[in-house]
């Protein structure tokens, strides 16, 4: 990937800022998400809650299923590959996917190395729990970062923890003297130029979304309050009682997160929320995959 292409991919991801990206498993769900105002959809055969419940090895979705969703909507379509699975990423690029998510939700294919995303033209999304993880993924070519959170739980606590951790570490890096950034980069295990960018600009060089456990308009507003530039919603919409209404409410809450009166109205009569899993009840911690 050329420097110009890398810059283009980062700019494409910037266009999603302030939006909501929704997990969908069928063309019908994709249309609901698009009608609700989603800025993109994530096409996958099973949403994270079902992946967690079923157990076993989870892999890239069937390309035919992904193509069906691509044909159903005009907004960008993302799809997931396993961490380190170069061949899955090549397949998704071959079917003209808009974004690839190298995702801890799926079973990792490589427990040491991530995909060299600089070898691809399609932009990549990657998860991170802290600043070091985020900058390492960006060094590998990621055009967009999201918190890992804990997918499929409906519990936002880990997404909150990861966003707070990342932003705290950014503030700490900004506060350093110029000659202290070298040591900080070494401790974070990241390239100096990326650490210097954060030090000088007070933010990541790519867009940073929240993901993992967002299930209500209030959850989305909370993540925006904490510095997210947009929100991924997985199981929280189509595992709820009224997906269309909840999807539209979360989109509006993300765009108007500072308007408490509107948030109160958006939170009314949404139907039953997804049945969640508390952090201390989780058996498999997906966020620990791919550091």
UniProtKB/Swiss-Prot annotation:
One Pfam family from the record: SOR_SNZ
Record carries keyword Phosphoprotein: no
Protein's pathway: Cofactor biosynthesis; pyridoxal 5'-phosphate biosynthesis
Residue sites binding D-ribose 5-phosphate per the record: 23, 152, 213, 234-235
Catalytically driven reaction(s): aldehydo-D-ribose 5-phosphate + D-glyceraldehyde 3-phosphate + L-glutamine = pyridoxal 5'-phosphate + L-glutamate + phosphate + 3 H2O + H(+)
Annotated CDD domains: pdxS (cd04727)
Lineage top rank: taxon: Bacteria
EC number of this enzyme: 4.3.3.6
InterPro entries: Aldolase_TIM, PdxS/SNZ, PdxS/SNZ_N, RibuloseP-bd_barrel
Family (UniProt): Belongs to the PdxS/SNZ family.
Role description: Catalyzes the formation of pyridoxal 5'-phosphate from ribose 5-phosphate (RBP), glyceraldehyde 3-phosphate (G3P) and ammonia. The ammonia is provided by the PdxT subunit. Can also use ribulose 5-phosphate and dihydroxyacetone phosphate as substrates, resulting from enzyme-catalyzed isomerization of RBP and G3P, respectively.
Subunit structure: In the presence of PdxT, forms a dodecamer of heterodimers.
Name the record gives this protein: Pyridoxal 5'-phosphate synthase subunit PdxS
Gene it is expressed from: pdxS
